[in-house]
């Protein structure tokens, strides 16, 4: 996938790709981490993950299946609506409360700690949401917080 543009660029002596934009977040890790990250690391490319907040699921807005019933985003988050998905959100909410941040801010700060990630991509529909996104650029998570999020993420992956 990424190797074709790399090899063609080298063969044709044209500029090589410098970044990719994968689907990557606490709920969607394996495809990027297992397949793409090794190529990105070898090619010294940047990573700009999209859906960093999993279509809003990682903001703490959805804490139970009942919270998702009338959501216009249900089709985008339906894979996450299960006990393991809600447990991950509970862990995000818990860490956010401990450090005085919003869950979405914590989720994006976690992404920033990942190898090769240059900057996560997340959308906002209000000024308040923009403030949370900006706060993620300076929020530093402790190793314990990262481990707790990794564990919750691993439990979610195992539930699929």
Regions found by a protein language model. Give the residues of each.
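Conserved histidine-centered catalytic loops in small-molecule metabolism enzymes
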Residues: 158-160
């Amino acid at each position: 996938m990424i190797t074709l543009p790399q090899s063609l660029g080298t063969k044709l002596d044209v500029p090589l790709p410098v970044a990719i934009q994968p689907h990557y977040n606490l709920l969607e890790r394996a495809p990027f981490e297992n397949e793409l990250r090794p190529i990105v690391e070898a090619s010294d490319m940047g990573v700009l993950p999209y859906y960093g907040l999993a279509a809003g699921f990682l903001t703490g807005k959805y804490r139970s299946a009942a919270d998702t019933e009338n959501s216009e985003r249900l089709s985008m988050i339906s894979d996450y609506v299960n006990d393991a998905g809600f447990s991950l959100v509970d862990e995000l909410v818990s860490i956010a409360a401990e450090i005085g941040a919003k869950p979405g801010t914590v989720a994006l700060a976690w992404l920033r700690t990942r190898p090769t990630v240059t900057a996560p991509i997340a959308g906002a529909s209000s000024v308040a949401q923009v403030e949370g996104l900006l706060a993620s650029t300076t929020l530093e998570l402790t190793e314990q917080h990262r481990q707790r999020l990794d564990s919750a993420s691993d439990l979610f992956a195992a539930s699929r």
